[in-house]
Structure formats: structure tokens, C-alpha cells
A protein has these predicted regions:
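Non-catalytic, usually N-terminal nucleic-acid engagement modules in DNA/RNA processing proteins
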Residues: 1-70, 119, 155-193
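A structural motif
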Residues: 51-53, 94-95, 142
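Catalytic cores of alpha/beta
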Residues: 84-89, 122-123, 129-144
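Histidine/lysine/aspartate-rich catalytic loop segments that bind and position anionic ligands
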Residues: 76-107
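Donor nucleotide-activated moiety binding/catalytic core segment of transferases
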Residues: 96-125, 133-135
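Glycine-rich phosphate-binding active-site loops on the catalytic face of alpha/beta enzymes
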Residues: 102-105, 129, 138-168
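A cross-family glycoside hydrolase active-site/sugar-binding cleft signature
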Residues: 4-8, 21-26, 56-59, 75-79, ...
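Short, charged, surface-exposed secondary-structure boundary motifs
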Residues: 84-90, 106-114, 134-136, 153-162
């Protein structure tokens, strides 16, 4: 699993962290997308930074292909499984697409099992902010995920950049170990439906 760090107050001091896709390589202007719902501003920033970005969030709840740079992989946030259709449209137009699983239950109307079953894309666990969510992302073998600083500790601890870097290294070591559901011999004998 490859982890990403989106924009946060410490991001300038975390540019040298290895093993993560660090903002702006992972572009996720949550303020423009979620709070302001200012897609024009987001698109302008996307085009302006297109040579620095590897992966970006595709604007939520947009069911058509926007004029976005083609050199970037897009995480399409899936709030309802029918929104996988926009991922299909993007792929048909030669965009690199990753399906985004909404970690917060209030932003989706499906289970993680339904998402894994329905998605034919690489999968991204959006907004990993608890140990439970990290374990879940590893268990279900997500390809990518972005973590929030809340995963690393309390607010007072997060003021210490060295503490944050140490915790990021610990998480990277945990993620680099193999995870997922353990197969049993019975898995090989169950007849497919």
C-alpha cells in the first residue's frame, strides 16, 4: 500500500519524508473542494501545478469529464456505487483513474465489501485518520490511501516535527509488511457461484 500526505500545516517541513506521496505530488485542496465547492479555483490550481502533481482528487459528485490535465492520476471519490460510472468515463477518455473509498460512513451509502466487489480499479482509502481505518485499508488490500495528521497522535504531539516524522516512519514500516486476509486451504475448494 502506498500512502499519501495531503496539505496540512506542517507540509513544508515534511517534504523530505520518504515512502509517501507528499503534497503537492498528492493534490487535495479540501478547502476548495469540500468547504467552498469552488471547482473553478481547484481546476486553476490543478493546471497551474500540473507538472508537480502525480495524483489528485477528482472533484466530488461531478458526473462528467472535466478539462483536467492528462498527466495526472485521478482519485474519484465514490459516495454511491453508481458514481463508478464517472471513473469509467474518465478511463474511456484515457485518464489514469483510482476509485476512492470514503472512510467516513456519512459520505457513502455502501459497505467496504460492496466497494471492493464493485470496483474494477486500483482503490484508494480516502482520509485514514484512525488506527482502525489503517488496519481496514491493509486488511482489504487497498492500493493507496491518504493519512491525516490525526492518525499520528494528539494535537500537542503534532507540533513537534521530529515526532511526526518518527510516526510517519513507523506507519510506513507497518504498511510495508504484508497484510490482508489469510487464505485457508478451504478457500481453494469453495466452488465459485
Amino acid at each position: 500500500m502506498i500512502l499519501a500526505l495531503g496539505y496540512n500545516p506542517l507540509i513544508q517541513k515534511l517534504q523530505d519524508v520518504t515512502g509517501y506521496i507528499v503534497y503537492p505530488k498528492f493534490f487535495d485542496n479540501k478547502k476548495a473542494l469540500l468547504i467552498e465547492r469552488n471547482y473553478k479555483k481547484y481546476l486553476k490550481e490543478l493546471w497551474f501545478n500540473r507538472n508537480r502533481i502525480e495524483v489528485a482528487l477528482y472533484p466530488d459528485n461531478i458526473n462528467y469529464v472535466l478539462p483536467v490535465p492528462k498527466n495526472i492520476a485521478y482519485v474519484v471519490p465514490i459516495h454511491t456505487l453508481s458514481q463508478l460510472e464517472i471513473a469509467d468515463k474518465l478511463r474511456e477518455n484515457n485518464y489514469k483513474v483510482i476509485a476512492g473509498y470514503a472512510s467516513d460512513q456519512k459520505y457513502r451509502d455502501y459497505t467496504i465489501q460492496d466497494f471492493i466487489k464493485a470496483s474494477k480499479y486500483q482503490n484508494w482509502y480516502l482520509g485514514i485518520s484512525t488506527k482502525h481505518e489503517l488496519k481496514e485499508a491493509l486488511f482489504y488490500s487497498f492500493d493507496y490511501g491518504d493519512i491525516t495528521l490525526m492518525l499520528l497522535g494528539r494535537f500537542q504531539q503534532l507540533r513537534d516535527v521530529n515526532y511526526v516524522k518518527r510516526k510517519l516512519k513507523e506507519i510506513q514500516q507497518l504498511v510495508s509488511k504484508s497484510h490482508g486476509r489469510q487464505s485457508s486451504i478451504l478457500d481453494f475448494f469453495v466452488k465459485p457461484r
